[in-house]
Every structure is written in structure tokens, then in C-alpha cells.
């Protein structure tokens, strides 16, 4: 990002590179690393983030999107909202509830879901800053009986909260780092 800042290029939001890749590298299987990391690095596959849910505000642990164990796959039902660029995404990394526990964070798992799967619907959220008119960035993503292979589970079932906290170390600020670097250089000049 220093090179981009030096060239005065705008920052970018690459959910694959800046968010899910570190999680896959730290907690994914060798097969997941081989399958996903090359396409993330080349930007062949575009990712979006499925954390927030309608009616939950910033309380991620209150999530209701459920992934039911069906043997060789999960059956996912629920919705995610404020999902940036979901209309262009090939994959979504998603927090889902795989069990009901006394401590809500313990029943959460981290799944990688193909956005082209049957049962996924993306609806735009029109905001005041949609520019130009008719374009949007954020969406609600609905999951209705979406089959997700078990091999798309990152790490262990029920440990998604740990992986989500790890991801948040990379999420905040990455999109602005080149702009901040540019401003710092201007102040020094």
C-alpha cells in the first residue's frame, strides 16, 4: 500500500486479500489454502463479508443465520446485511450459528460460501450516497436452504468467534492506509 500511496492511487477494498486470506492462512486446511489463496492473490475471485444481520446492530454474537449439519454439507438459512459489493462477489465469508450455547459466541462457525449457490438472493440497499444514482455498494444477502460443503468450514465448528476476532485485526483501517500515508507525507513536506 506504500507504493499505491506514493503513486497517489486511491485505496481499495479487497475483502479477499485484506480480510479472509489471513484467516485462511492461519486457520484453514492445506486444501483450503491451495484452493482459495491463489485466486485471492490474483483477484480472480471477489469476496464479500457476511457478519452483520438485520435487526442485530453491532451485536455480532446475536446472529441468527443458521447452518444445520446435514452430514456432508451444511444447510444455511438466514440473512446478512450491509454486505459491501455482494452483487459482484463470487464468495462470501460468513459467520453462522451451528449450535445454541449458553455463551452465544461459542455456537458460531466461520463458513466460506459460494455466492452463485442456489438459494442465495442479493438485494441492494439504497443509501443517500449512492453515486451515480442507481449504483450501490451495500446489500442484504438472503440464504434459503443453501447447501455448503463441509470442507468450506474454516477451522473447528463453534470456533468462528475466535476467527472473526482475528480477522478484525486486519479489517479496520486497511482501506484508508494509503490515504493516511499520503496525508502524512504532505504534512512532512
Where are these regions (language model features)?
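Internal helix-loop-helix
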Residues: 1-34, 38-44, 85-91, 156, ...
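Short Gly/Pro-enriched turn/cap motifs at secondary-structure boundaries
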Residues: 13, 55-58, 82-85, 100-102, ...
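Glycine-rich beta->alpha junctions and the first turn(s) of the following alpha-helix
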Residues: 15, 121-189
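Short loop segments at secondary-structure junctions
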Residues: 27-29, 70-72, 97-101, 115-118, ...
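A short, Trp-centered hydrophobic/proline-enriched beta-strand micro-motif
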Residues: 43-51
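Structural signature of FAD isoalloxazine-binding scaffolds in flavoprotein oxidoreductases
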Residues: 59-63, 142
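A structural signal for short hydrophobic beta-strand segments in well-ordered beta-sheet cores
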Residues: 65-68
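A short core secondary-structure module
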Residues: 73, 77-123
Amino acid at each position: 500500500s506504500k507504493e499505491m500511496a506514493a503513486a497517489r492511487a486511491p485505496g481499495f477494498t479487497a475483502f479477499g486479500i485484506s480480510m479472509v486470506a489471513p484467516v485462511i492462512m492461519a486457520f484453514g486446511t492445506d486444501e483450503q489454502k491451495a484452493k482459495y489463496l491463489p485466486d485471492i492473490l490474483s483477484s480472480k475471485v471477489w469476496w464479500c463479508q457476511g457478519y452483520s444481520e438485520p435487526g442485530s446492530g453491532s451485536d455480532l454474537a446475536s446472529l441468527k443465520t443458521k447452518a444445520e449439519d446435514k452430514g456432508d454439507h451444511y444447510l444455511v438459512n438466514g440473512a446478512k446485511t450491509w454486505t459491501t459489493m455482494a452483487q459482484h462477489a463470487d464468495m462470501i465469508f460468513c459467520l453462522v450459528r451451528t449450535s445454541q450455547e449458553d455463551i452465544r459466541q461459542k455456537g458460531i462457525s466461520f463458513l466460506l460460501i459460494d455466492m452463485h449457490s442456489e438459494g442465495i438472493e442479493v438485494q441492494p440497499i439504497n443509501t443517500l450516497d449512492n453515486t451515480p444514482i442507481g449504483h450501490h455498494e451495500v446489500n442484504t444477502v438472503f440464504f434459503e436452504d443453501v447447501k455448503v460443503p463441509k470442507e468450506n468450514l474454516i477451522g473447528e465448528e463453534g470456533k468462528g468467534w475466535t476467527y472473526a476476532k482475528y480477522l478484525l485485526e486486519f479489517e479496520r483501517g486497511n482501506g484508508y492506509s494509503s490515504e493516511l500515508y499520503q496525508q502524512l507525507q504532505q504534512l512532512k513536506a
